[in-house]
Amino acid sequence: MKEYFKLLGWQSCLLVLIGMLMLRTQIIIPFYQMYFPFTIIPFVDFLAFTFGMVLIMASFNVICSYYDTQMSDIIAKKKPTKAEELEQKNKYRMFWVLAILALAMEGFVAIKDNAWQVLGIGIVFELGAYFYALKYKREYLIGNIVISLLFAIIVFMPMLLEVFAFKNYQSEFPLRIPVVGIQSVMLVFVYFAAFVFLITFIRDLTLDLANLEDNKQKDLITFPVKEGVKATKILLNAVSVLFIALNVWFVYQFYEVIDMVHIVFILVLNIAFPMVYYLVNLNRTKLQMQYVMLYQYLGMVYISLLLTILFAGDIFKINAII
């Protein structure tokens, strides 16, 4: 059972589940309450949609494991045993079962809430995950960018579901949301998507550093293999500084809206400080195991981003009360 949970990537699945629920409860619902006494999408439908995204993430983890094992056997010129072949076949079947279940749930929501675009995005996301594992994961720098984009897209999914449904029901619910209001909530989602993109890129590149020697033996052309450790650290430093700068800008925008010093302090402490700690240790690190520890540490920054959503929701909660 433990092996199956690991194969499904239960940690990333849990992050998707909690993240999407928090984006809805802390940002979307308070935003709607400024203009309507309800939301367009019922909670049960949103829950089905969220579990569909969780299944897509699980299928993504399974297909990545399948192709990693397959590639390792090919490079090592190793003939798999019957037990290993059966395990690989089971992984491939599991991917398609999870993918079909995920798209069935997305299709249910699309039919019930007249938001067919959601099913289209789900199909594109599933195909993106499949081709990432099949091809882009092992390509120079492209793999790091593709995986970061896939994770960033997830951030927009809760809002896109509401937008598509609202557009289709606009004749029943006349549009009363000012353009400024729409821009403000979309700006928050853009910020969080940018945060997720950058932290995923940094984390994936850190993992490439940790697997440097192993990738050399497998003839995989990752960024550290081609450009070296020094160039990789320079790139990581630049992206990390960009991440911190984005956080500072986000906090500044936050302060202008709600003028609460304690929330500003918490936001800086919650995101900028962990990245400064990462930068200090990155430039001191030389051993492979230390890179692995940094990779694991960056997983905690995702949790920091989830906590930040709680404070971002205060923008709309306070405005709703006013």
Give the positions of each predicted feature.
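Multi-pass alpha-helical membrane architecture of UbiA-family
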Residues: 1-322
